[in-house]
Amino acid sequence: MFIWTSGRTSSSYRQDEKRNIYQKIRDHDLLDKRKTVTALKAGEDRAILLGLAMMVCSIMMYFLLGITLLRSYMQSVWTEEAQCALLNVSITETFNCSFSCGPDCWKLSQYPCLQVYVNLTSSGERLLLYHTEETMKINQKCSYIPKCGNNFEESMSLVSVVMENFRRHQHFPCYSDPEGNQKSVILTKLYSSNVLFHSLFWPTCMMAGGVAIVAMVKLTQYLSLLCERIQRINR
């Protein structure tokens, strides 16, 4: 009887030992699984934050471009590309200007005013040519305005070079107002459709990248939950 009881106790001890080993293995697997899930969740959270940050940055860039470049592009009336022929180019007078010489320091100077009159080939009108849209805003009497500086002779030399270039190339493309409200044309558009496209391209790529990151993380989470449900059903 003693021998039988001892054998039974030894057998029970072995079974308990096996159960403890299996339990330890199972606990170890569960711990590894929890660590993996925690690491994946942390990585997913970082990816979502990155995607949201990219979308917020792109929205801010859209806003800044909208109040600067896009508004100027929409307000520009010189939208029709045309051909201009030079009629007259001359330096008419000088205007006063001011330039910065340091923090809280401004000095007065002068710049020569270059006037260029052209013939618009499509209508035959005699119109004043401006370098860009901003030239008209600075001084409506001048076609080209050099940068205001301390050296007037340098500004005069630059304007003379521009004048000689016009005399050398008397036929050139320009931009006019198709509705005819502006009795002037411009030589170069600061806010063309090409400039607008390149300015909006990178914010759009950033927005698309942010949306793609968030969508991929959400899709991964959905597929993970779906696989877990399928495993539970199969059990």
UniProtKB/Swiss-Prot annotation:
The chain crosses the membrane at residues 47-67, 195-215. It is a multi-pass membrane protein. One of its GO terms (molecular function) is calcium-activated potassium channel activity. Residues 1-45 are annotated as: Ball and chain. Residues 68-194 are extracellular. Disulfide bonds: none annotated. This is Calcium-activated potassium channel subunit beta-2.
